[in-house]
């Protein structure tokens, strides 16, 4: 686990944890910061970037995700955030192993990139498109992730769509984490080094 990889892995998991925090906020309050989505959404359409930071609009919002990870690593107490992160990690792994579904995902993201030439990423049309991509090309890779929250919010189509979009962003961030050599074993066996990398992040 090189120092460079530790930095990239820490940043990618911070992004994933922020997306998961937004899932929880949407499910329990019906809203999440627009800035979070603005930062995360470009990663769905960007490929082969020179730096991990270049996949995102900005990384400043990821500080909250970093704080959640640091708290978990220090206190060792599981939380709803960690449970969702584990499920998203398994989902990303199964998705990557399913060649047909993964190919479908890439095709639909390419189509979304074309649509993004006409609409801002936060436009309702793009949110609906990304939500549909998650539902059709990601979620089927494993048993559905059960979202706990206020049913009055979760039954609203616009909020449910944003929950799916945040899950899609979390899956993408986990995929980037793996691309930079991330694995659950490294988090377990190099816990102190990973914690150091998280604390060294500058936003």
Swiss-Prot record:
Q: Which Gene3D superfamilies match?
A: HflD-like (1.10.3890.10)
Give the principal location in a single coarse category: cytoplasm
TM spans, by residue? none
How is this protein annotated for GO cellular component? cytoplasm; plasma membrane
Q: How does it sit in the membrane?
A: Peripheral membrane protein
Q: Where in the cell is it found?
A: Cytoplasm; Cell inner membrane
Does the keyword section mention DNA-binding?
A: no
Which InterPro entries does this entry report, sorted A to Z? HflD (IPR007451), HflD-like_sf (IPR035932)
Q: Which UniProt keywords apply?
A: Cell inner membrane, Cell membrane, Cytoplasm, Membrane
A Pfam short name: DUF489
Family, similarity comment: Belongs to the HflD family.
Q: Which HAMAP family match?
A: HflD_protein
**Name of the protein in its database record:** High frequency lysogenization protein HflD homolog
Lineage in the entry?
Bacteria, Pseudomonadati, Pseudomonadota, Gammaproteobacteria, Cardiobacteriales
């Amino acid at each position: 686990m090189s120092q460079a990889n530790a930095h990239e892995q820490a940043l990618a998991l911070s992004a994933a944890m922020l997306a998961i925090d937004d899932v929880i906020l949407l499910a329990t309050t019906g809203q999440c910061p627009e800035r979070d989505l603005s930062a995360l959404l470009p990663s769905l359409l960007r490929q082969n970037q020179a730096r991990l930071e270049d996949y995102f609009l900005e990384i400043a919002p990821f500080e909250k995700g970093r704080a959640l990870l640091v708290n978990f690593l220090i206190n060792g107490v599981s939380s709803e955030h960690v449970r969702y992160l584990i499920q998203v990690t398994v989902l990303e792994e199964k998705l990557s192993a399913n060649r047909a579904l993964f190919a479908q995902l890439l095709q639909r993201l390419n189509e979304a990139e074309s649509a993004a030439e006409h609409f801002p990423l936060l436009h309702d049309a793009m949110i609906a498109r990304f939500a549909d991509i998650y539902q059709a090309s990601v979620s089927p890779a494993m048993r559905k992730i059960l979202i706990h929250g206020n049913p009055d919010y979760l039954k609203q189509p616009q909020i449910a769509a944003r929950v799916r979009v945040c899950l899609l962003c979390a899956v993408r961030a986990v995929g980037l984490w793996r691309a930079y050599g991330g694995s659950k074993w490294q988090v377990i066996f190099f816990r102190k080094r990973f914690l150091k990398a998280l604390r060294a992040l500058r936003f």
